[in-house]
Design a protein with these regions (language model features):
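Residue-level recognition of well-ordered beta-strand positions that form the cores
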Residues: 12, 23, 168-170, 267-271, ...
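A residue-level signal for conserved active-site and pocket-lining positions in enzyme catalytic cores
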Residues: 9, 96, 162, 196, ...
Length: 346
């Protein structure tokens, strides 16, 4: 009986309290008596003592005084301001929920289910303030791959077992349907999966295509019909440029838009008001120097194609200064764009 009382106390406090919404012992006793009218104050007091003595394990705490005078004649001890230290703060849950809510590749119906599960991790006060109507107002017109979570499960299992996978890789057509990139719709690419990462709202598989010796990455929401092959995964140290192992953090820092190519040292000059945007893109992996006259010099190490797209998007704020071949590529892209717009006006 005592063991079940401990569970009931934790359950009630977890559902109804947090540090900002504590509960009095007498209110806790009232909740318990809805299930067992015979339970008494002393039994509850002793059980709370047990839980509070192991607060690091039970997550049960109390604030304020340990005695609550209900009347001049009542000198019995009561705990006040009891609460359960929730595993997630409201801010942490909101951050997780918004990440799912605005994800561009999670099927709409799955968002509803996942967010419902996340809401259950909070107490009644959190759920009262977190309206599920918000998700149902979102448009359901994002093109989706219904196999996304199946893909994640299978890839995760393959990585745990150290096995290769086979997968059909697709592109999205103008009708928002997926079509295999190869003429043979049943052709499965043989891949060595190493990690799954999120970038720019999309989930990527960092992998190696088995008949090559370099690292690459595929959009997981563009993959279909994934199967686990009964073949051991290729050791990452066998890949070009990864003989010392695979540092996923380093890989992500050098692939800002998950483009293809080897990181290259690139220098550019930028308006100093662009510094916040540069930091948003490159994080701490940019080196700033010689900030004067409203300009700053910058150095990054990213694939040239990545930098090409970024520089074109920000051509009014940044000027690439090296390498020369990247400058030539940017000039060519700008000339081509200018020719198109000039032709439109003539």
């Amino acid at each position: 009986m005592k063991k079940y009382l401990h569970f009931d106390l934790i359950r009630i406090l977890k559902e109804n309290t947090d540090r900002a919404h504590p509960m009095l012992q007498k209110d806790l006793l009232a909740e318990l008596r809805k299930k067992d009218e015979k339970i008494n104050r002393t039994t509850v007091w002793n059980a709370l003592n047990d839980l509070l003595a192991k607060s690091q394990e039970t997550r049960i705490h109390h604030l304020g005084e340990e005695a609550e005078a209900t009347s001049e004649k009542d000198t019995r001890q009561y705990y006040t301001n009891l609460y359960y230290d929730q595993e997630f703060t409201d801010a942490e849950l909101r951050w997780l929920i918004d990440g799912i809510l605005y994800s561009r590749n999670v099927p709409h119906a799955d968002r509803d289910v996942i967010i419902g599960k996340l809401c259950e991790l909070g107490n009644q006060h959190f759920r009262k303030n977190m309206s599920m109507k918000k998700i149902r107002r979102l448009s359901d017109d994002e093109p989706m791959n219904e196999e996304l979570f199946r893909n994640i499960d299978i890839i995760g299992k393959a990585m745990q077992e150290g096995k290769k996978i086979g997968a059909v890789y697709n592109y999205m057509g103008p009708d928002f349907e997926l079509y295999p990139v190869y003429d043979d719709p049943d052709y499965h690419q043989l891949l060595n999966p190493y990690a799954m990462v999120m970038r720019n709202g999309f989930y990527f598989l960092i992998c190696n295509k088995d008949n090559y010796d370099d690292m690459t990455h595929y959009r997981i929401d563009r993959m279909t019909d994934i199967i686990i092959e009964e073949k051991p995964i290729k050791p990452v140290r066998d890949l070009k440029d990864f003989h010392d192992g695979f540092d996923i953090q380093n890989y992500m820092e050098h692939n800002i838009n998950m483009a293809f190519g080897k990181p290259t040292r690139i220098t550019f000059q930028a308006n100093d008001y662009a510094i916040p945007s540069i930091i948003d893109t490159f994080g701490k992996n940019v080196i700033f120097s010689n900030q004067k006259d409203g300009k700053v010099e910058c150095v990054v190490n990213v694939p040239k194609y990545d930098m090409l797209r970024w520089a074109l998007q920000n051509c009014d704020q940044v000027t690439i200064t090296s390498p020369v071949e990247l400058i030539s590529d940017i000039k060519e892209c700008l000339r081509h764009a200018l020719d198109i717009y000039v032709a439109q006006q003539s």
